[in-house]
């Protein structure tokens, strides 16, 4: 009598239909054949249990996932699995992940498992809104048509009082920074309450906009429980802000989907910080790729998301970051494009290479590379803007520095250093 049925989920001659969701996995079997391991993934992520059953509903039979591709790759294998849409609730990222990234990661029959990519058909994708603004919308409300947007986190990222933070914000915005940004763990504290900060910072922003005749914005961190985030978003909108920042991984997908609806009602763009992503994206053999995370975030509707730099201090090589950025900026049915954010170890000397690698549709966030300028944050901001202008004009930084003392001092300090 047949007991296990994992191979029933493997059909390498199967051709997926246009209305099926395709998922690509890397896996390493543990004590079972590659075919059985792949079948176990397909079974557990669709309708399966470990054994044959007394009765099988007709709908369940039609909902069986199918492994249709299996090839050796390094120490493991690449499998492609087709999932009928009957397995998925419309418009629910959390239900999708409970299937394709759920129990399968705990199976003993696998040494390693990594979700590489997924391809939703339009019939599934149409239930997601994507970004409210996207690249085009953000460029319009910021009034920046061609160059990369600039952003800075006041460093150190903790410890500022509201008044101190406001003073730094004034200097940074006045020096040419477009977007002031809170860091991932900077929310609300006895020494710097969110409610006080939001009011003070937007007053400063209005002053700088009048003085510089440039649009300025504040990526204020509203991360918290859902009820707290909603209240904070309302405060931002009431003060005339047009952005909020959310730590999307620690906040969770369900909360992010809810806040996408809230921010649309309030007219707010979402800046997505990816803190904690490396817990499951960094190991090349196990977890979920940052590419897949970026795709999920775009479906839900963030307007910009951190992707890496390839030249800074954070993990992520050029090919990985380039692939993510290219996807975020590509046409994808009705889903708007998303601004990639380069951050982590950036300074003026790296601008020509960064822009050469990734182009001008980019948010360039430099924290220490602005705040660490010998003459202070305003000079650091101007040095960054001058370096970006030089890169776009095709002018060598050393040549540009002859007319920019701020850039010269930045180059004297950091040169073209790539932080480790």
From Swiss-Prot:
Tagged with keyword Lyase: yes
Site location (Transition state stabilizer): 313
Location of the active site: 155, 273
Keywords of this entry: Carbon dioxide fixation, Lyase, Magnesium, Metal-binding, Oxidoreductase
UniProt record similarity statement: Belongs to the RuBisCO large chain family. Type III subfamily.
Note: Because the Archaea possessing a type III RuBisCO are all anaerobic, it is most likely that only the carboxylase activity of RuBisCO, and not the competitive oxygenase activity (by which RuBP reacts with O(2) to form one molecule of 3-phosphoglycerate and one molecule of 2-phosphoglycolate), is biologically relevant in these strains.
Name of this protein: Ribulose bisphosphate carboxylase
